[in-house]
Design a protein with these regions (language model features):
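Structural/interface elements that position substrates and couple domains in central-metabolism enzymes
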Residues: 1-254
């Protein structure tokens, strides 16, 4: 099974092998939470997290992998393994403070876009909200621990009218959350039509390549909150839009 790939085989104890898996995933999750905290600070001091992450990643001791700011990690591995290691350490009487901090930061980061949008909508009652992207990452229909569902629940509890689009995740969302009272769009144009605000939750290629002019064309007012930094600010500035992303300056050309 492994010989054709010429992979190194490390002989360790069962306990050590388990710890390698937990420690590796938790360290990667920590990198994500760390860069998200730095991104939040960048917004206050006027730095650009894309530039900061690029500079950090050039240091071989750090590396550029998992230094992508956004609205937190999801999926089946990182949430499960961070919580498991935190539980096991507590049970053993050891406080793994960095692991707990990783979990706490990620939990708060997941609703960052709603927090940002409060400047326009103290409450979302009767607000038409477009959710662009449902899955925890592009290229999958996996909704486990995806930030979109948590945000949708908050919006619905406040009385918002939510319409969502995702190229792969819609059917899985319907099956997984049959009682979730939202509408689904066939394409991004339909999701944006007459929307008061747009939240980008997943960096699908179709979103990255989506024409920025269309936000103004279809929305009542182009208020866009991007949780995955899908667009270059230099391109956003060429269009009539309010655009707030993660760890970067706000573009307001309205």
């Amino acid at each position: 099974m492994y010989a054709p790939r010429e992979l190194p085989i490390v002989h360790v104890s069962v306990r050590s092998s388990e710890m390698i898996k937990y420690a590796s995933n938790d360290f990667l999750a920590l990198k994500i939470s760390y860069i998200n905290e730095i991104a939040n600070f960048c917004e206050i001091v006027g730095a650009d997290i894309e530039e900061v992450a690029r500079g950090m990643g050039m240091d071989r001791r750090i590396g550029s992998n998992f230094l992508k700011a956004g609205i937190g990690y999801g999926g089946s591995c990182f949430p499960k393994d961070t919580k498991a290691l935190n539980f096991q350490s507590d049970h053993a009487g050891v406080k793994l403070k960095t692991v707990k901090a990783t979990i706490d930061v990620n939990r708060e980061q997941r609703t960052k876009l709603i927090d940002k949008a409060r400047r326009f909508f103290p409450t979302f009652r009767d607000v038409r909200v477009a959710i662009i992207g449902l899955t925890f990452k592009p290229g999958t229909d996996d909704l486990r621990e995806a930030p979109a569902k948590q945000n949708i629940d908050i919006l619905l509890n406040e009385g918002a009218n939510v319409i969502a689009w995702d190229p792969l995740g819609v059917e899985n969302f319907r099956k997984r959350y049959p009682d979730c009272a939202i509408n689904f769009a066939e394409n991004i144009d339909e999701a944006l039509t007459d929307a008061d605000v747009c939240f980008i939750m997943t960096e699908w290629e179709k979103i990255v390549e989506y024409p920025l002019d269309n936000y103004k064309k279809y929305m009542r007012r182009p208020l866009v909150f991007d949780g995955r930094n899908c667009y270059k600010l230099s391109e956003v500035e060429k269009h009539e839009i309010f655009y707030d992303s993660i760890g970067r300056k706000i573009v307001d050309t309205l």
